Amino acid sequence: MDPVDPNLEPWNHPGSQPRTPCNKCYCKKCCYHCQMCFITKGLGISYGRKKRRQRRRPPQGNQAHQDPLPEQPSSQHRGDHPTGPKE
């Protein structure tokens, strides 16, 4: 291993910075480009602001979705399992 100049900061040591700039590609090679690419692309960790997802609202003029449901009988027997007492 080559000796490193002790006067250099650790982020300026030779080999500490990649030769090419980071890009937005998510291929395997670019995910391992540098530590920052690995954390953001490979692991998917991002400490930026979260974007608020807007809810989809129905149009204001459309009242078709506000129609009341028709009354239905409360007791309906279905299948072979009656809910009443056995005779």
Curated annotation (Swiss-Prot):
Entry keywords, A to Z: Acetylation, Activator, AIDS, Apoptosis, Host cytoplasm, Host nucleus, Host-virus interaction, Inhibition of host innate immune response by virus, Inhibition of host interferon signaling pathway by virus, Interferon antiviral system evasion, Isopeptide bond, Metal-binding, Methylation, Modulation of host chromatin by virus, Modulation of host PP1 activity by virus, Phosphoprotein, RNA-binding, Secreted, Transcription, Transcription regulation, Ubl conjugation, Viral immunoevasion, Zinc
GO function term, MF aspect, one: metal ion binding
Comp. bias regions, Basic residues: 48-58
Domain of life: Viruses
Ranges for region Transactivation: 1-48
Residue ranges of the motif Nuclear localization signal, RNA-binding (TAR), and protein transduction: 49-57
Modification sites for Asymmetric dimethylarginine: 52-53
Site (Essential for Tat translocation through the endosomal membrane): 11
Annotated region described as Interaction with the host capping enzyme RNGTT, given as residue ranges: 49-87
Function, in words: Transcriptional activator that increases RNA Pol II processivity, thereby increasing the level of full-length viral transcripts. Recognizes a hairpin structure at the 5'-LTR of the nascent viral mRNAs referred to as the transactivation responsive RNA element (TAR) and recruits the cyclin T1-CDK9 complex (P-TEFb complex) that will in turn hyperphosphorylate the RNA polymerase II to allow efficient elongation. The CDK9 component of P-TEFb and other Tat-activated kinases hyperphosphorylate the C-terminus of RNA Pol II that becomes stabilized and much more processive.
Domain note: The cell attachment site mediates the interaction with ITGAV/ITGB3 and ITGA5/ITGB1 integrins, leading to vascular cell migration and invasion. This interaction also provides endothelial cells with the adhesion signal they require to grow in response to mitogens.
Subunit structure: Interacts with host CCNT1. Associates with the P-TEFb complex composed at least of Tat, P-TEFb (CDK9 and CCNT1), TAR RNA, RNA Pol II. Recruits the HATs CREBBP, TAF1/TFIID, EP300, PCAF and GCN5L2. Interacts with host KAT5/Tip60; this interaction targets the latter to degradation. Interacts with the host deacetylase SIRT1. Interacts with host capping enzyme RNGTT; this interaction stimulates RNGTT. Binds to host KDR, and to the host integrins ITGAV/ITGB3 and ITGA5/ITGB1. Interacts with host KPNB1/importin beta-1 without previous binding to KPNA1/importin alpha-1. Interacts with EIF2AK2.
Protein name (record): Protein Tat
Taxonomic lineage of the native organism: Viruses, Riboviria, Pararnavirae, Artverviricota, Revtraviricetes
